C-alpha cells in the first residue's frame, strides 16, 4: 500500500486486531484453543493462490469472523461464486464448534447488468457465472456440510431468507446495485 491507502490499511488492521483480541477472549473457547483452530484453517490456505482473492484476504476475513464469535447470530456471505471463501468460513465455524450457521446468497447466474454507478467496469452481465452444483461440489470435495444456500440476485431474495440475527456479513458483490440491494 502507498500513501493514504497505507494509512487506511494500517488503521483497519489495528482496529481489526483489537476486535479480534476481544472476540477471542470473550467467546468462551479460550484464546489458546481459538488460535489453534484458526491457525489450522489458515494453514490450509497457506501458499495457495486464489483466483478471486488477493494475498492475505482469507486471513483477514477469518480474523474478522473470529472477532465476533461472542456476538449472537449467524454468518452470511453475499456473493459466493464457487465457494472458496465460503468453504474457509465453514471450516472455521465447524472446527470452532460455536453453533453458528453459514448462509450464502448468490444468483449463480453471474453478475447482474451494470448501471451508470459502475462506471467503466470491464465485466458484463453474466460474467463469473458458476452453477449451484459447482458450488456444492466445492463443499463435497472438502467433506464439509453445505451452508444454507439462497439463490437469487440480492434485491430479489425475501427478507425471510435471512437469519433473524447476523453476527458477521461478508459482502462480495461486484457492482454498485448488488451492494445497495
Feature roles, as predicted:
Residues 18, 23, 30-55, 62, ...:
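S-adenosylmethionine/decaboxylated-SAM
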Amino acid at each position: 500500500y502507498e500513501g493514504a491507502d497505507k494509512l487506511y490499511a494500517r488503521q483497519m488492521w489495528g482496529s481489526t486486531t483489537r476486535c479480534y483480541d476481544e472476540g477471542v477472549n470473550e467467546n468462551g473457547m479460550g484464546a489458546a484453543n481459538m488460535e489453534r483452530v484458526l491457525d489450522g484453517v489458515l494453514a490450509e490456505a497457506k501458499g495457495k493462490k486464489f483466483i478471486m482473492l488477493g494475498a492475505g484476504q482469507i486471513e483477514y476475513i477469518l480474523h474478522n469472523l473470529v472477532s465476533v464469535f461472542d456476538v449472537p447470530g449467524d454468518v452470511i456471505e453475499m456473493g459466493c461464486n464457487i465457494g472458496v471463501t465460503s468453504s474457509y468460513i465453514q471450516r472455521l465455524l465447524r472446527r470452532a464448534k460455536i453453533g453458528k450457521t453459514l448462509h450464502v446468497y448468490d444468483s449463480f447466474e453471474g453478475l447482474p447488468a451494470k448501471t451508470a454507478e459502475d462506471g467503466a467496469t470491464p465485466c458484463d452481465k453474466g460474467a463469473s457465472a458458476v452453477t449451484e452444483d459447482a458450488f456444492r461440489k466445492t463443499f463435497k470435495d472438502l467433506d464439509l456440510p453445505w451452508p444454507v444456500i439462497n439463490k437469487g440476485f440480492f434485491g430479489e431474495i425475501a427478507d425471510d431468507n435471512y437469519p433473524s440475527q447476523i453476527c458477521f456479513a461478508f459482502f462480495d458483490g461486484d457492482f454498485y446495485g448488488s451492494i445497495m440491494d
